Amino acid sequence: MARGQQKIQSQQKNAKKQAGQKKKQGHDQKAAAKAALIYTCTVCRTQMPDPKTFKQHFESKHPKTPLPPELADVQA
């Protein structure tokens, strides 16, 4: 039964190592993506990463609504 005990110890050691690496890494891709979405459409509440995309979205999805003042000088 020595191998069974070694296997359990190896699994515990590996789990501890994996947990340490996760803590060290500390980067969450979903959180980073969410932080990048800083522009929110006033009509449909869709979030966009930059003003150019925001203006393109607004012109294509809400053509009858007047452009917000923050998009007036943006080059699309």
Curated annotation (Swiss-Prot):
A Pfam family assignment: SERF-like_N
Bias (Low complexity): 1-13
Residue intervals of every C2H2-type zinc finger in the record: 39-62
Biased composition (Basic and acidic residues): 53-62
Biased composition (Basic residues): 14-25
Disulfides per UniProt: none
Major location category of this protein: cytoplasm
Keywords: Cytoplasm, Metal-binding, Nucleus, Repressor, Translation regulation, Zinc, Zinc-finger
Localisation: Cytoplasm; Nucleus
InterPro entries: MBS1/2-like, SERF-like_N, ZNF706/At2g23090_sf, Znf_C2H2_type
GO terms of biological process kind: negative regulation of DNA-templated transcription; negative regulation of stem cell population maintenance; regulation of translation
Gene Ontology molecular-function annotations: zinc ion binding
GO cellular component terms, semicolon-separated: cytoplasm; nucleus
Annotated region described as Disordered, given as residue ranges: 1-32, 53-76
PANTHER family membership: GEO09665P1-RELATED, ZINC FINGER PROTEIN 706
Annotated function: Transcription repressor involved in the exit of embryonic stem cells (ESCs) from self-renewal. Acts by repressing expression of KLF4.
Name of this chain's protein: Zinc finger protein 706
Gene: Znf706
